[in-house]
Amino acid sequence: LSGVRVTDLHAGVNPGDPVEVFYAVKYTPLFNYFLKVMPYSTVLTTSLINILYXDNVALAFXXI
């Protein structure tokens, strides 16, 4: 899943839709920091995920 865009992982999820982050395939320092300050169940938007992680992290999530 490395390099997969967030919007590629779940058909029907559009930028700005709420998603729940379950697991990160690859870690970056920024992502690791956010995991420490936010629980896994933190509700983010796909736009925010793209800003924070770009293409460096592939995320598995489920639509809320």
From Swiss-Prot:
Q: What class of enzyme is it?
A: ligase
Record flagged with keyword Nucleus: no
Biological process per Gene Ontology, one example term: translation
What domain of life does the native source organism fall in?
Eukaryota
- What's in the keyword line of the UniProt record? Aminoacyl-tRNA synthetase, ATP-binding, Ligase, Nucleotide-binding, Protein biosynthesis
Q: Which GO terms describe its molecular function?
A: ATP binding; isoleucine-tRNA ligase activity
Catalytic activity, reaction form: tRNA(Ile) + L-isoleucine + ATP = L-isoleucyl-tRNA(Ile) + AMP + diphosphate
For this protein, the Enzyme Commission number is 6.1.1.5
Subunit text: Member of a complex that includes annexin.
Family listed: Belongs to the class-I aminoacyl-tRNA synthetase family.
Name the chain's protein. Putative isoleucine--tRNA ligase
The beginning of the lineage is: Eukaryota, Amoebozoa, Evosea, Eumycetozoa, Myxogastria
